[in-house]
Amino acid sequence: MVQSKAKAGFQAGVKDYRLTYYTPDYTPKDTDLLACFRVTPQPGVPPEEAGAAVAAESSTGTWTTVWTDGLTDLDRYKGRCYDIEPVPNEDNQYFCFVAYPLDLFEEGSVTNILTSIVGNVFGFKALRALRLEDIRFPVALLKTFQGPPHGITVERDKLNKYGRPLLGCTIKPKLGLSAKNYGRAVYECLRGGLDFTKDDENINSQPFMRWRDRFLFVQEAIEKSQAETNEIKGHYLNVTAGTLEEMMKRAEFAKEIKTPIIMHDYLTGGFTANTTLARWCRDNGVLLHIHRAMHAVIDRQKNHGIHFRVLAKCLRMSGGDHLHSGTVVGKLEGERGITMGFVDLMREDYVEEDRARGIFFTQDWASMPGVMPVASGGIHVWHMPALVEIFGDDSCLQFGGGTLGHPWGNAPGATANRVALEACIQARNEGRSLAREGNEVIREAARWSPELAAACELWKEIKFEFEAMDTL
């Protein structure tokens, strides 16, 4: 019966996507996954056809009518382009809003969501360029994800550190140190006043420093610095590996030696590996630091790719306790409004639509734990007031060269950063404006801290003043 009905209603051929997938009268449901694409059609392609093509090719459609369309309920499963807006101050660019039914996606799988929405349509010839700007994940879908292994509140309880940002450092040079010298640098930084040190993203298990040797020397440094400072310390041990089995072996060894936190490169490692590791971290009480290596390949271009706010949302669902988020004031890309938009999406429970900050949809995270943003890249002591004022307490401020580049060595570099941070927190708590008085706060603290004074003198002229590309 179904077969004869399908035969009777089937008309072979090619028809415009907009006839089926452009539905301006559609009202999105609470259970729909909503996506905003920045679409640049090829000359002569109407925006309605381009938006409908995106909806079709990222859901149920293909380039021609197929007989098996009659064997399913297309209206139930198809994506719908329900709204189109011209992009302000841009020629032939449009924000196309697409609603996807919940049943199109596997529960608890970021991999499946991204494969569906961006896996194929970005190579579509009718489009000159395409960028995924934002996604609204429905609560019904979010509840199928674990999210971060622990979250900000649990991390602070584990570390017994409250009322200020956490302070970190990436060990440099990133490649070439032996395991013992690497551990020595970790010890000096932690003893000097930092909360964390970090493997760089490309430190895995190279011939000059195998992972097991690094883990052991670093853990010795952590325990020695903790005994001397009476503070809980940690080092982000990068467990990223060539296979999932090897990654989990490294994670198990890190737990065995009682390290408090491990690290993963989530984009190069992949979302399946990241979700697996995040679930293991919750089960085993280990914090998870996430590096975004490779993100700029995906998100740097304004009209093509995936915006980092989408990658950050996906990471929160996949799982991670920390995520690098740019600095606004350092050497890496990041305009303040846009950056703080996705920082809020990482750590807040409910975020309202705010186009000025690039947030296209209101997002309810349904009590999913938050991710702590990590500001890292080209920052030093003179940036401290701005970083505290911009990111607030629930953040990790990470100084690599800004610690290890101190003229007196690693421990004095760490001390300089800790003094600068404590001075900024005290000034803020006393009601002073860090935006207006930040430099004076640092100068006052430098009068009684020779380590900070030396750092201030060294980096007083260093600035990274380039226009951000990531703007609305």
From Swiss-Prot:
EC number: 4.1.1.39
Predominant subcellular localization, coarse grouping: other
Protein name as catalogued: Ribulose bisphosphate carboxylase large chain
Its job: RuBisCO catalyzes two reactions: the carboxylation of D-ribulose 1,5-bisphosphate, the primary event in carbon dioxide fixation, as well as the oxidative fragmentation of the pentose substrate in the photorespiration process. Both reactions occur simultaneously and in competition at the same active site.
SUPFAM superfamilies cross-referenced by the UniProt entry: RuBisCo, C-terminal domain, RuBisCO, large subunit, small (N-terminal) domain
PTM-bearing positions, type N6-carboxylysine: K198
Annotated binding of Mg(2+), by residue: K198, D200, E201
Cofactor(s) needed by this chain: Mg(2+)
InterPro entries, per the entry: RuBisCO, RuBisCo_large_chain_AS, RuBisCO_lsu_C, RuBisCO_lsu_C_sf, RuBisCO_lsu_fd_N, RuBisCO_lsu_N_sf, RuBisCO_lsuI
GO terms for MF: magnesium ion binding; monooxygenase activity; ribulose-bisphosphate carboxylase activity
Sorted UniProt keywords: Bacterial microcompartment, Calvin cycle, Carbon dioxide fixation, Carboxysome, Lyase, Magnesium, Metal-binding, Monooxygenase, Oxidoreductase, Photorespiration, Photosynthesis
Catalytic activity: 2 (2R)-3-phosphoglycerate + 2 H(+) = D-ribulose 1,5-bisphosphate + CO2 + H2O; D-ribulose 1,5-bisphosphate + O2 = 2-phosphoglycolate + (2R)-3-phosphoglycerate + 2 H(+)
